[in-house]
């Protein structure tokens, strides 16, 4: 109960009215006020922009689990086959839904006042790890960021481990009480040369797992959201005891992302 505040507390007003009618001196504390909870959060969103994100959300396979060829010529053929990029598109791609989700989460975080960065990643062999900035952690939102979102396009393969480690270095410079890495992907980690002979898929998964453990050791909480319907097969290993969610309907990503962020950070 407050003597001054934003709005009347209807229960207190009724009680005061009853007191007056019965000859009792009413309380002057008739108001209430919303107390804003001080948040100290920094979060990086990592978007997978591998070639598979060029797929239509209607025609995407139940699993984005492919064998990435190590031969350079075969690798480029593989990348081109995954992109399927035509001049005119009449369908929505996975990457288009990722962009929509980015716009919505930006709107939510601008209202919350949390520190946040949005980056996208891919890979083209060990010497060509791709990491691009959509919005840096220290950057104020501006029209240039909207332009960067528009220009995001499917690239190569899914080299997660190095992208996560680079993100750790970015968050290490921020002294927020709560720090998070939010990984958004459509498939398992894989890339040309992202392997040891005979254990290609396992090596990529375990390297990513180790990168996530390194994040936790720095006080950073990782979370993975995937639209790969068979994601449980490898995420149980890759995420260890970290949280993840497999989204069965890709079109729900823009609505689900802010909900998960709220649950994760409160």
Where are these regions (language model features)?
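Negatively charged sequence features
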Residues: 1-68, 74-76, 80-81, 115, ...
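Short secondary-structure boundary/capping segments
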Residues: 59-64, 132-138, 195-202, 238-243
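Intrinsically disordered, low-complexity acidic Ser/Thr-rich regulatory segments
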Residues: 76-101
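An active-site-proximal "capping" alpha-helix that borders the catalytic cofactor pocket
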Residues: 96-113, 118
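Von Willebrand factor
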Residues: 129, 133-179, 189, 226-229, ...
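VWA/integrin I-like adhesion module and closely mimicked acidic/polar interface patches used
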Residues: 151-157, 168, 187-236, 247
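C-terminal helix of von Willebrand factor
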Residues: 242-266
């Amino acid at each position: 109960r407050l003597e001054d505040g934003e709005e009347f507390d209807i229960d207190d007003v009724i009680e005061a009215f009853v007191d007056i009618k019965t000859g009792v001196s009413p309380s002057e504390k008739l108001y209430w006020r919303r107390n804003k909870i001080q948040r100290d959060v920094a979060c990086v969103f990592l978007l997978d922009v591998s070639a598979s994100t060029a797929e239509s959300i209607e025609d995407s396979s139940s699993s984005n689990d492919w064998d990435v060829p190590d031969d350079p010529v075969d690798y480029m053929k593989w990348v081109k086959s995954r992109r399927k990029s035509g001049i005119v598109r009449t369908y929505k791609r996975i990457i288009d839904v990722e962009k929509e989700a980015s716009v919505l989460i930006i709107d939510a975080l601008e209202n919350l006042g949390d520190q946040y960065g949005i980056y996208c990643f891919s890979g083209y062999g060990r010497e060509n790890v791709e990491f691009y900035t959509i919005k840096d952690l220290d950057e104020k939102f501006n029209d240039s960021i909207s332009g960067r979102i528009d220009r995001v396009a499917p690239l190569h393969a899914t080299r997660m481990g190095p992208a996560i480690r680079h993100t750790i270095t970015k968050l290490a410079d921020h002294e927020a009480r709560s720090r998070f890495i939010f990984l958004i992907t459509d498939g398992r980690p894989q890339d040309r040369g992202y392997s040891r002979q005979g254990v290609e898929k396992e090596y990529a998964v375990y390297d990513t797992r180790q990168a996530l453990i390194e994040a936790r050791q720095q006080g950073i909480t990782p979370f993975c959201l995937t639209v790969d319907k068979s994601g449980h097969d490898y995420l149980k290993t890759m995420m260890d005891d970290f949280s993840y969610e497999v989204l069965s309907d890709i079109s729900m990503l823009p609505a689900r992302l802010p909900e998960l962020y709220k649950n994760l950070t409160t």
